[in-house]
Amino acid sequence: QPFGLALVIAPWNFPFLLALGPVVSAITAGCSVVVRPSNDAKYSAKLLHDLIAQYMDPDVCRVVGAGHPGDGIDTMNAVLDQKEFDVVFFTGSSRVGRIVAKKCAEHLTPCVLELGGKNPVIVSEDCGNVDLAAKQCVWGRMLNCGQQCVSPDYVLVHESIEKEFTEKCEKWVKTFF
């Protein structure tokens, strides 16, 4: 059975992907959706608002907050205080995730939190392709300026291949950028 009304609180990085992915999942599961884009991506939020308003039934999907006149809701806390949501999906920082979880707990609203974290990469001495490992580490860290929840935060490299790995990373940074 569908949960009912889902609230999707989207982050500023990847503003369309990380808003629309949960929206599609919720609608596919039979839920209607309210999307709360980030204030830090106001132009993307405005476009998302305009497109959803133009192409979606407002009883199925609508956008609130992020400075859109007429919504009457301009902060995340105000949105969460509405008590109308049956499930909340939040993508963002651990700090804000705690706030969302606390607000949801007040109303016994189930929530899904996709939070940033520490993402180590381990390159062992028996790594079959140090060049490929370096390439993937550099690409993963630099993609979207490193502003993604799955971006490598640090690399633990076995000392026997540390020099080779570092040289390969330098090569890939120069190649990509």
Regions found by a protein language model. Give the residues of each.
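Conserved small-residue-rich beta-alpha loop and adjacent elements
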Residues: 1-55, 59, 108
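General beta-strand structural signal in soluble alpha/beta enzymes
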Residues: 35, 63, 90-92, 111-113
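ATP-dependent adenylate-forming carboxylate-activation enzymes
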Residues: 35-51, 64-73, 124-128
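A structured beta-alpha segment of the ubiquitous adenosine-cofactor-binding alpha/beta core
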Residues: 63-89
